[in-house]
Amino acid sequence: MESYKCRVCFKSFVNGKALGGHMRSHMSNSHEEEQRPSQLSYETESDVSSSDPKFAFTSSVLLEDGESESESSRNVINLTRKRSKRTRKLDSFVTKKVKTSQLGYKPESDQEPPHSSASDTTTEEDLAFCLMMLSRDKWKKNKSNKEVVEEIETEEESEGYNKINRATTKGRYKCETCGKVFKSYQALGGHRASHKKNRVSNNKTEQRSETEYDNVVVVAKRIHECPICLRVFASGQALGGHKRSHGVGNLSVNQQRRVHRNESVKQRMIDLNLPAPTEEDEVSVVFQ
């Protein structure tokens, strides 16, 4: 935790407001001392320097700091109220130091460096830390930049490769059916027309084959064959007339068979009213 110390009496306070109220009491006391002539201060400073060289060195450093701050405050145009208060505090601090040296005792915290040196060290540390962080960030940025450059190069290479492929494939038109490549779109169109013609011719041949097969089936269905003599006729009328002939022939054959049967039956029967046949007489003579 940062401690707030008074530069005059070296008391520590909790916050800056308490320190400011304490410094106002010193300012009221030092206002009367500032009205004295500056020659007395220089004489006292010379006496103090002759009596104590260490304190003379510190007081001279503090005076130089006060003079430099007063000069810088004069050069700056827009001075703030805090800056003016700081210069007054430094002057009062110098006068208090001179008084203490004249009285002949030293403060316990005389060897401690002033607050300005501590602030300078802290600012230097902050600057060093900032520089270190910036260097790290810069290194990371360089690395990321390299990666970005590599990515851009790869993208450019891929784009160039694609352009080369497009240049090689440019002016070539490929047929989707047979896979042939043509230089112009017109040639590809003519080639596609030939494919269409082939498709039409194939469709026609398929239709013809289908019609022929249907005709064959119809012809096969229209064949008129005689079941008796296995003769084929073009129409059913011819086949009917042929079948009638087969019916007439069958009738004549049946009649002949019937006549032959009747004759055989008649031969087997003996009629006593009729004379004996001559053949039988001859047979009887032979047996005698």
UniProtKB/Swiss-Prot annotation:
Pfam families recorded: zf-C2H2_6
Alphabetical list of SMART domains matching this protein: ZnF_C2H2 (SM00355)
A biological-process GO annotation: regulation of DNA-templated transcription
Gene3D superfamilies: Classic Zinc Finger
Cellular localisation: Nucleus
UniProt keywords, alphabetically: Metal-binding, Nucleus, Repeat, Transcription, Transcription regulation, Zinc, Zinc-finger
GO cellular component term of the entry, any: nucleus
Residue spans, zinc finger C2H2-type: 4-26, 173-195, 224-246
Stretch list, region Disordered: 20-82, 101-123, 189-210
Keyword Nucleotide-binding included in the entry's annotation: no
Amino acid composition bias (Polar residues), ranges on this chain: 37-52
Function: Probable transcription factor that may be involved in stress responses.
Protein name from the UniProt record: Zinc finger protein ZAT9
Source species of the chain: Arabidopsis thaliana (Mouse-ear cress)
Biological classification of the source: Eukaryota, Viridiplantae, Streptophyta, Embryophyta, Tracheophyta
Gene field: ZAT9
